[in-house]
């Protein structure tokens, strides 16, 4: 038995003293996981989150400038000149407009604005406005200073309320030609008194007609006299209208009563984001590339999930919580069946720390110590592919589609519902496309890495040939001595197998001879043990018979 133990120890020592080279991957303590088409929560050495999820919670400037914050006013209150919005009359510039949900200063005198949503969209799409006078007071030969308690005993800054003067209201006929070289937004209104008495007190007659014409429009209006529900202390109403006077066009207004006449107009210039945010967010001293009603964000990632109403230089919105792209290897310490390529050779338990130059590499041990090096060729190819993957995803998702918070009036509620459903469906499709694209890329990445490690392992295996033996753990035990220079030739593909073939053959025969001697010794010991055991049993049985016969416990009869 002592001989057997000695041989076993010799074999272990022989194996442990062999020079060795292993193929492995960069070691990490990563807890990152990604999803693929076939697996969820696959551990990986490195992953990149493609989804931006944070915002600063503030209203910020964008590349187009600062926002116009209306505070207590609405956009229509600004356009028509609500007297409570006087601070905004000096003109302004904006990249987007902020309207507070609690804004109360809109149309102070009750009534409806025709095509209000289109007007708000037109105004907000510009980046600046300038107020200009189009019909001066001196053009009227009636009173032009009508006011209302509903408007703080004042009236709109962009229109004049024309009423009778000295119990007379002759036909008013005014013209304005746009020589400004830019389009002018102008507004007017028609008053609908609650009673005939109020009508005649204001305009001396009940049957009046107003016409407003340009090269593009030809509108005629008559008042609808009658009481309405009390709003802002008024039973009367004003219907509000607007139009755009293009350069060179002429506006003509004719009326013998009930006219709220144009006074000032707006020259709209430039182009903004065209967005109206209804939010109570505070304005911050910040500049962002992308703004939402929840806050601003800056990111280089291709996707975000902050708000579908984002605008600016924004990544694509997808309504998911995470989109992780695998940019490294499977972080699996033990060999197992993975991916499309089966068992992956070269995955060393725990990986190697220090292989910082890349994913794939070699570790060796010889008389000079232990060394480690990355395989720069395969690593660089992998890095190049990873670098291009994010760009490919961005390119594949670069079709521009912005969800705009469309405004519809109450009569268009059904249209609004349909629009929202369409927007939601499109967003769901984008999210599905993004997730599917990332799943496909992750599957491809991990399978490519599996193949790369396998190829590197097989490359070394082919180079070494019979000069080494696989240990089953991603390593090769060499039958010859291999210094650091020799190890480098294995790594860079210049290994000369014939140079070490004779030394390897002798070492292999030596090891195989030890194995044969060991096997012969085992056979001899086995035979000896069997014979000895049989003799001991036979002698024991004979002694038992002798003892039994001597004391009469056993008798032997021989019959002939």
Predicted regions and their residues:
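Extracellular/luminal domains of secretory-pathway glycoproteins
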Residues: 2-560
């Amino acid at each position: 038995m002592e001989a057997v133990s000695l041989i076993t120890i010799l074999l272990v020592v022989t194996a442990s003293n062999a020079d060795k080279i292993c193929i492995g991957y960069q070691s990490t303590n990563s807890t990152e996981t990604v999803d693929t088409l076939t697996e969820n929560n696959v551990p990986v050495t490195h992953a990149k989150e493609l989804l931006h999820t944070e915002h600063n919670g503030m209203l910020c400037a964008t590349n187009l400038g600062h926002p116009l914050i209306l505070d207590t006013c609405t956009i229509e209150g600004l356009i028509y000149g609500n007297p409570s919005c006087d601070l905004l009359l000096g003109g302004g510039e904006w990249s987007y407009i902020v309207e507070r949900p609690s804004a109360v200063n809109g149309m102070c005198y009750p009534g409806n604005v025709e095509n209000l949503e289109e007007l708000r969209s037109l105004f907000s799409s510009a980046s600046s406005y300038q107020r200009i006078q189009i019909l001066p007071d001196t053009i009227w030969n009636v009173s032009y200073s009508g006011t209302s308690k509903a408007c703080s005993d004042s009236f709109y800054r962009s229109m004049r309320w024309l009423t009778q003067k000295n119990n007379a209201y002759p036909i008013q006929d005014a013209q304005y030609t746009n020589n400004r070289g830019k389009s002018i937004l102008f507004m007017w209104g028609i008053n609908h008194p609650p009673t005939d008495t109020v009508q005649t007190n204001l305009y001396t007659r009940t049957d009046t007609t107003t016409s407003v014409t340009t090269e593009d429009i030809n509108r005629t209006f008559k008042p609808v006299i009658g009481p309405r529900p009390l709003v802002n202390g008024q039973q009367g109403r004003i219907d509000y209208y607007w139009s755009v006077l293009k350069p060179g066009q002429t506006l003509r207004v004719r009326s013998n009563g009930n006219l709220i006449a144009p006074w000032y107009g707006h020259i709209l210039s430039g182009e903004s984001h065209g967005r109206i945010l209804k939010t109570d967010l505070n304005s911050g001293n910040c500049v962002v590339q992308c703004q939402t009603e929840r806050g601003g964000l800056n990111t280089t990632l291709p996707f975000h999930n902050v708000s579908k109403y984002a605008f600016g230089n924004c990544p694509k919105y997808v309504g998911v919580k995470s989109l992780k792209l695998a940019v490294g290897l499977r972080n699996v310490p033990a060999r197992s069946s993975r991916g499309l390529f089966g068992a992956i050779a070269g995955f060393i338990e725990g990986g190697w720390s220090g292989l910082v130059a890349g994913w794939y590499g070699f570790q060796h041990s010889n008389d000079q110590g232990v060394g480690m090096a990355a395989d720069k060729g395969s690593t660089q190819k992998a890095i190049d592919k990873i670098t291009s993957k994010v760009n490919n995803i961005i390119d594949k998702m670069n079709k521009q589609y912005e969800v705009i918070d469309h405004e519809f009036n109450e009569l268009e509620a059904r249209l609004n519902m349909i629009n929202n459903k369409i927007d939601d469906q499109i967003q769901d499709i984008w999210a599905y496309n993004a997730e599917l694209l990332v799943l496909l890329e992750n599957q491809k990445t991990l399978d490519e890495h599996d193949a790369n490690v396998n190829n590197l392992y097989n490359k070394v295996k082919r180079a070494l040939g019979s000069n080494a033996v696989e240990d089953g753990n991603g390593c090769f035990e060499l039958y010859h001595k291999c210094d650091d220079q020799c190890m480098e030739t294995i790594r860079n593909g210049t290994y000369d197998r014939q140079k070490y073939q004779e030394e390897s053959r002798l070492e292999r025969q030596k090891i195989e001879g030890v194995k044969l001697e060991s096997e012969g010794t085992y056979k001899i010991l086995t035979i000896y043990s069997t014979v000895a055991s049989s003799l001991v049993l036979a002698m024991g049985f004979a002694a038992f018979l002798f003892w039994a016969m001597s004391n009469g416990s056993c008798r032997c009869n021989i019959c002939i």
